[in-house]
Amino acid sequence: GRVILDKVPTLKPEISGDFSKLMSWADSYRKLKVRTNSETPLDTKTAREFGAEGIGLCRTEHMFFDEDRILSVREMILSKTIEDRNKALAKLLPHQKNDFIQIFEIMSGLPVTVRLLDPPLHEFLPKNDKEIGDLSSVTGLNANEIKSRTEELHEHNPMLGHRGCRLGISFPEIYEMQCRAIFEALVECKKKKLKSTMPEIMIPLVSTEAEIKIMKDLVIRVTKKVQDENNTKISFLVGTLSLIHI
């Protein structure tokens, strides 16, 4: 082999030649379908090129970390009123909707499992003085207020804390925005006469039957609003990842 000490032009990997032939033989016999994990249009396109037959997990929180979105996310988290929180969510809606439009277009009728916001909110908050300063200029809060709020939201054991569907119950407007983005993206794809994608909405970290009922009712409520606003019918699945002890 060779040791290269500098950057060199690279080639995009592709399935070709003998490997492509071998995989085509496997395709003619296999019974399983393979989906991908993807949260961006670019990753989704790459996965389709490699033969993915749907998205098994689209983690929506990863869409929030882009530079043009993270400030609005932090503004939403630090909002003291529902009105202020909704203003911040209104800034995020177009971004998330556009992501879903592109993902649904690329998947072209294949199933897409979308997991609603899962991590605890402190994971989105600023980690250094520059980020705190940027957030201060947007929210009007001083650095000490932001640091104090960050400490309040910090979860010592996030797996058992305020995350997943428990966030959706405490702040339903967050999940309402995400569901609206999904359904409005479906409507846009329908207007473009694209193949209909069946989104599978995953409610994260459900512990009880009551939690899934609350979240299911929220999803259905948003669906009806978007259907009425656009005079159309929307098809989807809603559920959760369950662990069964045998």
Segments (PLM) and residue ranges:
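Conserved alpha/beta-domain cores
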Residues: D18-I244
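Phosphate/pyrophosphate-binding betaalpha-module
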Residues: L5
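Conformationally flexible catalytic loops at phosphate/diphosphate-handling active centers
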Residues: G1
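C-terminal, low-ordered peptide segments at domain boundaries
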Residues: K12-S16
